[in-house]
């Protein structure tokens, strides 16, 4: 976080909590946090002017059930969870909802040349979509694709989301590359994906917001046709891009 933020704990949950009055003054009523699951910060890390720049975007998840340790201001073991809970409580006290950006389309283990520290070791064939010759389908653009509609993986995702709702009191989720959550084990799009249906009708998740980034890196684009059961909202990427180009004046769209 840039020093101009003026916060005591930049780049942390506590640092964001310091800016809540500013958000309140803007009239903000909901905050969407980029991925806060524990993720691989060293992927794509680089040295620039002798400064080590880490990957802080969060889109290389390592553990779906744990908040990222580096977002703790104290850097003490197990403090990150308490600090995130404190942030969410303060946002709620100021009448702001909290949406988590969640990444269930892939993990930081990458393809067959990537590291092995979780699902590859548990059961590679269950947790990942594999081609007939044992390579990884890459509908995520990140090396592997989580096999979301296998019963084991589906239950893990449901348990994870319930955990974040019950334990952290989050108000909703934005699903990165959500179209992957509707593919079967060989990547074929399903008409009624078991995972998406289960999410739509789950008793614990019934009152939380479900927001789909309704496309993936495999070319599947489902804006306007995402399986929703009247429960899912959708990001409209093309509208977003058109509005950005218009506001910037690209291609003379503002003339």
Descriptions of predicted regions:
Residues 1-170, 174-201, 220:
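Substrate-binding/active-site clefts of carbohydrate-active enzymes
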Residues 169, 182-186, 190-255:
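Conserved alpha/beta catalytic core and glycan-binding cleft of carbohydrate-active enzymes
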């Amino acid at each position: 976080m840039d020093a101009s933020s003026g916060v005591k704990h930049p780049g942390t949950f506590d640092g964001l909590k310091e800016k809540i009055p500013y958000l309140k003054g803007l009239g903000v009523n909901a905050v969407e946090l980029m991925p806060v699951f524990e993720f691989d910060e060293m992927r794509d890390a680089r040295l620039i002017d002798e400064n080590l720049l880490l990957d802080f975007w969060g889109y290389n998840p390592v553990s779906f059930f744990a908040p990222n340790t580096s977002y703790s201001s104290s850097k003490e073991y197990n403090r990150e969870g308490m600090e995130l809970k404190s942030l969410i409580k303060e946002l709620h006290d100021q009448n702001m909802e909290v949406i988590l950006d969640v990444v269930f389309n892939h993990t930081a283990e990458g393809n067959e040349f990537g590291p092995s520290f979780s699902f590859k070791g548990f059961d590679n064939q269950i947790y990942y979509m594999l081609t007939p010759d044992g390579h990884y389908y890459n509908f995520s653009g990140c090396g592997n694709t989580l096999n979301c509609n296998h019963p084991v993986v589906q239950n893990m995702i449901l348990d994870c989301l319930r955990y974040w709702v019950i334990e952290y009191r989050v108000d909703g989720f934005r699903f990165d590359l959500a179209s992957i959550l509707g593919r079967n084990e060989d990547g074929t799009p399903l008409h009624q994906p078991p995972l998406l249906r289960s999410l739509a009708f789950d008793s614990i998740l019934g009152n939380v917001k479900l927001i789909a980034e309704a496309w993936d890196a495999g070319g599947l684009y489902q804006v306007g046709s995402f399986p929703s059961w009247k429960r899912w909202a959708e990001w409209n990427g093309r509208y977003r891009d058109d509005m950005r180009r218009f506001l910037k004046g690209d291609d003379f769209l503002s003339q």
